[in-house]
Amino acid sequence: MFTLHTKERERIMKAIRINETGGAEVMHLEEIEKPTAQAGEVLIKVAAAGINYADLMQRQGTYLTRTRTPMTMGFEVAGTIEALGVGVTTPPVGSRVVAFGAGGYAEYTTALAATIIPIPDNMSFESAAAFPVQGITAYQLLHESTHLQAGESILIHAAAGGVGTLAIQLAKLMGAKTVVGTAGSAEKLQLVRELGADAAINYKDADWAEQVQQATGGKGPDVILEMVGGDIANKSLQILAPFGRMVIYGAASGERAEFSGIQLMYKNQSVIGYWLTAWMSRPDKTAEAAKGLMQYLASGKMRIIVGNTFSLHQAVEAHKAIADRKTTGKVVLTV
């Protein structure tokens, strides 16, 4: 019977892989060769990996960029530094870090040393893995895309999700006068209220748009964070306040939104697109967002909502739970 020698075994790791695009069932736990830190990189022993809706789209082959298979899933991880590549001197081996690491659904991954973020001693790996993608997204949606101002009102769709739960708190910290969040269940609406939203509205209600207008004093929200698409996006633009800004950072429904250029002109409104991957080409801005988030988290002014955790071999179940809208906050895989 063939068995791997100890040294050979040390070069092997477990990872969630896809060999084709499709439903959650195309993901499989496989044994592959452990990566090696190249120049400018660090090798990370993964303790937790965050799951984002973009992961589902990538798995389905519907993401903004082409899904190249075979591939290891995942994009953000928290863990400890196992080894340093050539030219890397800090942080030292053994440091607790969070990073953007392609192939994060695995026991090990590599990341550029310049992009890693130290984890405070009082933060768990699960919480750390929950904030990079969605935290930086929430921060940049408010600071860079819409430039939310103190005293303004904001509508946050999918407010009980990873981005939404952080955006509610950030908007309040930035001085928003009225924060309105939408969600699809009583449990999620309760979470939205607990995080500080002034109004929590069920998007399944036929008159949800009218409820938003009422909550904003009849004017409509000055800022809208939109990631659903289709009719939700269309109605959102209809109630956007004059001189308002609506940023689109997803299309979870898969449905096309249709906007009137005449309306945008008449009401001096703006519709803005946001894609984190493109912002990664501006590491100064990414670092600025990460630093701002860490300051809020370390001070206790913000908290990360880790709603559901699954083990690595439960990646299929985790993706299905997100697709079925059965989760709140951030979904994390533990390794």
In which residue ranges do the predicted regions lie?
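Short, Lys/Arg-enriched N-terminal segments with co-localized hydrophobic residues
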Residues: 2-12
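Glycine-rich beta-strand-centered segment in the early N-terminal region that forms part
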Residues: 33-50, 62-103
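NAD(P)H dinucleotide-binding glycine-rich loop of Rossmann-like/cofactor-binding domains
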Residues: 57, 68, 90, 96-160
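Mid-domain Rossmann-like dinucleotide-binding core that forms the NAD(H)/NADP(H) cofactor-binding site
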Residues: 129-205
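NAD(P)H cofactor-binding loop motif with strongest signal on the N-terminal glycine-rich segment
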Residues: 158-159, 228, 251
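Glycine-rich phosphate-binding loop and adjacent beta-alpha segment
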Residues: 176, 187, 192, 231-302, ...
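Short amphipathic alpha-helix with an adjacent loop that forms part of the alpha/beta core around
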Residues: 208-218
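C-terminal capping/lid region of NAD(P)-dependent oxidoreductase domains
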Residues: 218, 299-308, 316-335
